[in-house]
């Protein structure tokens, strides 16, 4: 009475209840009394000039946060490796980079009976 590979005995509790509607829901948060909520949301008076100055740092301060040698913009922040072995350089060994799309032409004709 052996089970085959990949055969489950069934049952058990799943952690994927959010996908399959698995019964238990999160308990609802208790509502605070309205009077207490109003007291908590009333902020102390603050000067608008101090808030505006703290919220928007100057361009010089923003430049200080960027590490030296990094030239980037907010729109293009992808990391590009820059070292002696990056880009076009000559070696005495063939490249292992894949030059053909899947299902397309291939330089591996010696394996697959090339055309």
UniProtKB/Swiss-Prot annotation:
Keywords: Microtubule
GO cellular component, one term: cortical microtubule, transverse to long axis
Start and end residues of each stretch annotated as Disordered: 29-48
Any Gene Ontology biological process: cortical microtubule organization
InterPro entries, alphabetized: SPR1/2/3/4/5 (IPR039613)
Function text: Acts in maintaining the cortical microtubules organization essential for anisotropic cell growth.
Family of this protein: Belongs to the SPIRAL1 family.
The protein's name: Protein SPIRAL1-like 2
Source organism (scientific name): Oryza sativa subsp. japonica
């Amino acid at each position: 009475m052996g089970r085959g590979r990949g055969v489950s005995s069934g049952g058990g509790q799943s952690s994927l209840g959010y996908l399959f509607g698995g019964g238990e829901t999160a308990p609802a948060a208790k509502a605070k009394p309205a009077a207490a909520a109003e007291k908590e949301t009333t902020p102390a008076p603050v000067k608008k000039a101090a808030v505006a100055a703290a919220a928007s740092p100057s361009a010089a301060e923003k430049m200080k946060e960027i590490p030296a040698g990094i030239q980037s913009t907010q729109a293009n922040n992808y990391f590009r490796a820059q070292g002696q072995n990056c880009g076009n350089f000559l070696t005495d060994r063939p490249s292992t980079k894949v030059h053909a799309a899947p299902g397309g032409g291939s330089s591996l004709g010696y394996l697959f009976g090339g055309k």
